[in-house]
A protein has these predicted regions:
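Substrate/cofactor-recognition hotspot
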Residues: 156
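Predominantly extracellular/secreted Zn2+-dependent metalloproteases
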Residues: 1-153, 163-208
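Walker B catalytic acidic pair
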Residues: 159
Length: 208
Protein backbone atom coordinates (compact mmCIF):
# COMPACT_ATOMS: atom_id res chain seq x y z
CA UNK A 1 0.00 0.00 0.00
CA UNK A 2 1.55 3.33 -0.99
CA UNK A 3 2.07 6.00 1.64
CA UNK A 4 -0.95 8.23 2.29
CA UNK A 5 0.55 11.32 3.99
CA UNK A 6 -2.72 13.25 3.78
CA UNK A 7 -4.48 10.77 6.08
CA UNK A 8 -4.73 11.51 9.79
CA UNK A 9 -5.23 9.02 12.61
CA UNK A 10 -8.93 9.92 12.65
CA UNK A 11 -9.23 8.72 9.05
CA UNK A 12 -8.00 5.22 9.84
CA UNK A 13 -9.73 2.32 11.56
CA UNK A 14 -7.93 -0.91 12.42
CA UNK A 15 -10.10 -4.02 12.19
CA UNK A 16 -8.96 -7.54 12.98
CA UNK A 17 -11.07 -10.30 11.41
CA UNK A 18 -10.51 -13.89 12.46
CA UNK A 19 -12.37 -17.13 13.05
CA UNK A 20 -10.13 -18.01 16.00
CA UNK A 21 -12.39 -19.24 18.87
CA UNK A 22 -10.48 -17.25 21.50
CA UNK A 23 -10.80 -14.00 19.56
CA UNK A 24 -14.48 -14.71 18.91
CA UNK A 25 -14.97 -14.74 22.68
CA UNK A 26 -12.98 -11.53 23.14
CA UNK A 27 -15.24 -9.80 20.61
CA UNK A 28 -18.19 -10.37 22.95
CA UNK A 29 -16.70 -8.27 25.77
CA UNK A 30 -18.67 -5.03 25.94
CA UNK A 31 -16.47 -3.16 28.42
CA UNK A 32 -13.28 -1.37 27.42
CA UNK A 33 -11.11 -1.79 30.48
CA UNK A 34 -7.41 -1.01 30.35
CA UNK A 35 -5.18 -3.57 32.06
CA UNK A 36 -1.92 -2.38 33.61
CA UNK A 37 0.46 -3.55 36.30
CA UNK A 38 2.00 -1.79 39.28
CA UNK A 39 4.30 -2.54 42.20
CA UNK A 40 2.40 0.16 44.11
CA UNK A 41 4.39 0.72 47.34
CA UNK A 42 6.42 -2.51 47.17
CA UNK A 43 9.72 -0.60 47.01
CA UNK A 44 8.84 1.53 50.03
CA UNK A 45 8.57 -1.26 52.56
CA UNK A 46 4.79 -1.48 52.43
CA UNK A 47 3.30 -4.19 54.63
CA UNK A 48 1.13 -5.65 51.87
CA UNK A 49 2.26 -4.68 48.36
CA UNK A 50 4.86 -6.78 46.53
CA UNK A 51 6.14 -6.99 42.96
CA UNK A 52 4.24 -8.92 40.31
CA UNK A 53 6.13 -11.61 38.38
CA UNK A 54 5.60 -12.70 34.75
CA UNK A 55 3.43 -15.70 35.65
CA UNK A 56 1.19 -13.64 37.94
CA UNK A 57 0.85 -11.06 35.16
CA UNK A 58 -0.44 -13.81 32.88
CA UNK A 59 -2.90 -14.99 35.50
CA UNK A 60 -3.97 -11.37 36.04
CA UNK A 61 -4.72 -10.84 32.36
CA UNK A 62 -6.65 -14.13 32.25
CA UNK A 63 -8.63 -13.09 35.34
CA UNK A 64 -9.55 -9.71 33.85
CA UNK A 65 -10.52 -11.23 30.50
CA UNK A 66 -12.64 -13.89 32.16
CA UNK A 67 -14.34 -11.42 34.47
CA UNK A 68 -15.14 -8.93 31.69
CA UNK A 69 -16.38 -11.72 29.42
CA UNK A 70 -18.60 -13.15 32.15
CA UNK A 71 -20.13 -9.76 32.95
CA UNK A 72 -21.08 -9.38 29.27
CA UNK A 73 -22.57 -12.87 28.99
CA UNK A 74 -26.22 -13.79 28.83
CA UNK A 75 -25.63 -16.44 31.48
CA UNK A 76 -24.47 -13.88 34.03
CA UNK A 77 -27.12 -11.32 33.26
CA UNK A 78 -29.93 -13.87 33.51
CA UNK A 79 -28.63 -15.04 36.88
CA UNK A 80 -28.17 -11.47 38.10
CA UNK A 81 -31.85 -10.77 37.44
CA UNK A 82 -32.65 -13.24 40.23
CA UNK A 83 -30.79 -10.90 42.62
CA UNK A 84 -33.12 -7.97 41.94
CA UNK A 85 -33.54 -6.17 45.26
CA UNK A 86 -30.81 -8.22 46.98
CA UNK A 87 -27.79 -6.25 45.79
CA UNK A 88 -27.61 -3.24 48.13
CA UNK A 89 -25.50 -0.10 47.91
CA UNK A 90 -23.48 1.52 50.71
CA UNK A 91 -26.66 2.98 52.17
CA UNK A 92 -28.53 -0.31 52.14
CA UNK A 93 -30.71 0.65 49.18
CA UNK A 94 -31.37 -1.79 46.30
CA UNK A 95 -29.06 -1.27 43.33
CA UNK A 96 -30.70 -0.77 39.94
CA UNK A 97 -29.36 -3.69 37.91
CA UNK A 98 -29.26 -1.84 34.60
CA UNK A 99 -27.30 0.96 36.28
CA UNK A 100 -24.91 -1.64 37.69
CA UNK A 101 -24.41 -3.15 34.24
CA UNK A 102 -23.59 0.28 32.87
CA UNK A 103 -21.24 0.93 35.77
CA UNK A 104 -19.32 -2.24 34.92
CA UNK A 105 -19.17 -1.41 31.20
CA UNK A 106 -17.93 2.13 31.84
CA UNK A 107 -15.41 1.23 34.55
CA UNK A 108 -11.99 2.45 33.43
CA UNK A 109 -10.00 -0.69 34.05
CA UNK A 110 -7.67 -2.41 36.48
CA UNK A 111 -4.11 -1.75 37.61
CA UNK A 112 -3.10 -5.20 38.78
CA UNK A 113 -0.82 -5.73 41.75
CA UNK A 114 0.32 -8.42 44.15
CA UNK A 115 -0.31 -8.47 47.89
CA UNK A 116 0.80 -10.59 50.84
CA UNK A 117 -0.75 -10.89 54.28
CA UNK A 118 -4.24 -10.23 52.94
CA UNK A 119 -6.28 -11.79 50.14
CA UNK A 120 -6.70 -8.57 48.21
CA UNK A 121 -6.81 -4.79 48.14
CA UNK A 122 -9.03 -2.86 45.75
CA UNK A 123 -10.75 0.40 44.97
CA UNK A 124 -11.13 2.57 41.88
CA UNK A 125 -8.62 1.15 39.40
CA UNK A 126 -6.47 -0.44 42.11
CA UNK A 127 -6.79 -4.22 42.08
CA UNK A 128 -4.39 -6.36 44.06
CA UNK A 129 -4.65 -10.05 44.92
CA UNK A 130 -2.45 -12.57 46.68
CA UNK A 131 -0.68 -15.20 44.59
CA UNK A 132 -3.06 -17.96 45.68
CA UNK A 133 -6.05 -15.84 44.68
CA UNK A 134 -4.76 -15.10 41.18
CA UNK A 135 -4.09 -18.82 40.70
CA UNK A 136 -7.06 -20.18 42.64
CA UNK A 137 -10.06 -18.69 40.85
CA UNK A 138 -10.25 -21.17 37.94
CA UNK A 139 -12.98 -23.80 38.07
CA UNK A 140 -10.41 -26.60 38.34
CA UNK A 141 -8.59 -24.95 41.24
CA UNK A 142 -11.11 -26.53 43.62
CA UNK A 143 -12.37 -30.10 43.88
CA UNK A 144 -15.31 -31.13 41.66
CA UNK A 145 -18.58 -30.65 43.49
CA UNK A 146 -17.17 -28.21 46.03
CA UNK A 147 -18.96 -24.92 46.70
CA UNK A 148 -17.92 -22.35 44.08
CA UNK A 149 -17.66 -19.56 46.67
CA UNK A 150 -14.05 -20.33 47.60
CA UNK A 151 -11.89 -17.68 49.26
CA UNK A 152 -9.91 -16.80 46.09
CA UNK A 153 -13.13 -16.27 44.10
CA UNK A 154 -14.69 -14.34 46.96
CA UNK A 155 -11.60 -12.09 47.06
CA UNK A 156 -11.67 -11.67 43.27
CA UNK A 157 -15.20 -10.28 43.22
CA UNK A 158 -15.00 -8.59 46.65
CA UNK A 159 -12.16 -6.39 45.42
CA UNK A 160 -13.97 -5.68 42.17
CA UNK A 161 -16.96 -4.59 44.25
CA UNK A 162 -14.63 -2.02 45.82
CA UNK A 163 -13.46 -1.00 42.34
CA UNK A 164 -17.08 -0.24 41.50
CA UNK A 165 -17.24 2.07 44.51
CA UNK A 166 -18.95 -0.16 47.05
CA UNK A 167 -17.87 -0.44 50.69
CA UNK A 168 -18.26 -3.13 53.33
CA UNK A 169 -21.62 -1.55 54.16
CA UNK A 170 -22.99 -2.86 50.86
CA UNK A 171 -23.75 -6.42 49.75
CA UNK A 172 -21.21 -6.04 46.94
CA UNK A 173 -18.22 -7.10 49.04
CA UNK A 174 -19.23 -9.37 51.94
CA UNK A 175 -22.27 -11.58 52.38
CA UNK A 176 -23.99 -14.15 50.21
CA UNK A 177 -25.06 -11.90 47.37
CA UNK A 178 -22.69 -10.37 44.80
CA UNK A 179 -19.65 -12.57 45.40
CA UNK A 180 -21.75 -15.76 45.50
CA UNK A 181 -23.58 -14.77 42.30
CA UNK A 182 -20.31 -14.05 40.51
CA UNK A 183 -18.38 -17.07 41.80
CA UNK A 184 -21.20 -19.46 40.93
CA UNK A 185 -21.59 -18.27 37.34
CA UNK A 186 -17.80 -18.05 36.92
CA UNK A 187 -17.30 -21.70 37.90
CA UNK A 188 -20.16 -22.96 35.73
CA UNK A 189 -18.90 -21.07 32.69
CA UNK A 190 -15.39 -22.40 33.31
CA UNK A 191 -16.65 -25.97 33.60
CA UNK A 192 -18.57 -25.59 30.36
CA UNK A 193 -15.57 -24.16 28.49
CA UNK A 194 -17.26 -20.82 27.89
CA UNK A 195 -14.67 -18.46 29.40
CA UNK A 196 -11.72 -17.18 27.35
CA UNK A 197 -9.27 -18.92 29.72
CA UNK A 198 -10.99 -21.75 31.57
CA UNK A 199 -8.16 -23.62 33.25
CA UNK A 200 -5.11 -22.70 35.29
CA UNK A 201 -3.16 -25.13 33.12
CA UNK A 202 -3.84 -23.03 30.01
CA UNK A 203 -1.76 -20.28 31.60
CA UNK A 204 0.91 -22.30 33.37
CA UNK A 205 1.68 -24.58 30.41
CA UNK A 206 2.60 -21.66 28.15
CA UNK A 207 6.34 -21.20 27.51
CA UNK A 208 7.98 -18.56 29.68
Amino acid sequence: VPAQPELSNDDVTLLVRTEDPFMKKIEQIDSRWFIRFSAYSADKGHAYWRHMDPLLCRHGVALALNMAFMFASEEFNVEMNAYEGKLKDNGGKPINLDALRQRIRSHGGLVLGRVVGVGGLGGGNTYGLADYCYKGVYFDATAPGSHPHSYPRQAMFHEYGHCLGYSHSSTMTYGNQWTVLCATVFVVMGQEGKLPVCSKEQVENLPM
